[in-house]
Amino acid sequence: MIAIPCMDTMPTLFVSSLVLMDKMPETEMAFAVSSLIYDARNTIAASALRNNFDRLLWIDSDMKFDRDMMKRMAQRMDEGYRFVTGVYCMRKPPYAPVLYKAFEPGIDPMPFSKGELDPGKGMIQIAGCGFGAVMMDVSILSEMKNQRSDYPFSPFLGLGEDLSFCKRATEMGVKLYCDTSIRLGHVGLQEFRL
């Protein structure tokens, strides 16, 4: 399932990427509209569990990506990875990568440097990431539901919903990875890219 949480409108660069994307056979899409992104993510997560999907591809509505992104992430999942993201940056200076070596609630996360994310590095383990483009095994949500009483994307104090999810997942022993060869643009008034 392709999971797209959004607030209201979607930039043309995102829509064109989505339309042109090489989709896997029988792929469904779920849009959840909410002014609270964590609520939209929790709604889609519950639907994925209820409908017995195997994988979720989260794509934020402000991302621009290559048409083969889904297939490349699926290939990594087929290799045994349960959580895969790509490389993109924040939309404001200093345009830091939205990939973290370490983070704790209330403390600024420690991002990877651009040099550490060279496309030739391939797969690297991360502590957390933004959810602009993440493919994950739905079994992670199932395990989380069985081990915790809170919603998977409910934000911890001092963390967004994406890093809060990553914290929950890593506390359960889930390993998170970034494929540094998968590059995305983050769309604002212009496209931002590393």
Annotated model-derived regions:
Residues 53-64:
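Short beta-strand-to-loop acidic/aromatic patch adjacent to the donor-nucleotide binding site
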Residues 149-159, 163-186, 191-193:
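Catalytic donor-sugar/metal-binding loop of nucleotide-sugar-dependent glycosyltransferases
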Residues 30-33, 87, 180:
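Residue-level recognition of beta-strand->loop/alpha-helix junctions
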Residues 23, 78, 170:
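Anion (oxyanion) recognition and catalysis
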Residues 55, 81-83, 176:
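Short, Asp-centered acidic motifs that coordinate Mg2+ and/or phosphate
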Residues 42-55:
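Active-site nucleotide-sugar/metal-binding loop of Leloir-type enzymes
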Residues 1-39:
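N-proximal low-complexity "stem/linker" segments adjacent to membrane-targeting elements
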